[in-house]
């Protein structure tokens, strides 16, 4: 079991049933780990605002925690408005943001 699989197993054990995702290449291990979890459903969104808004709505309507999976800092920036709304509404939401591989850090990519 790798770290991504352990994280997804922990989320499932905590009652998380859905992950709203807009992943990039840096989150592929997490995507693969979600795919292995029979208890978690992955929903792909084509924009981070859609992903975070859907997770907020899901959490408000079901009173169950949802997970978002976003791509790097720009992905987080695109989803921040809805994450702010979710926080203000006390929506049960867990946000995961990927990061560059260590060997890519020297390029200082966004």
Each language-model region and where it sits:
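N-terminal alpha/beta PP-like core and its mobile active-site loop of ThDP/TPP-dependent enzymes
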Residues: 1-110
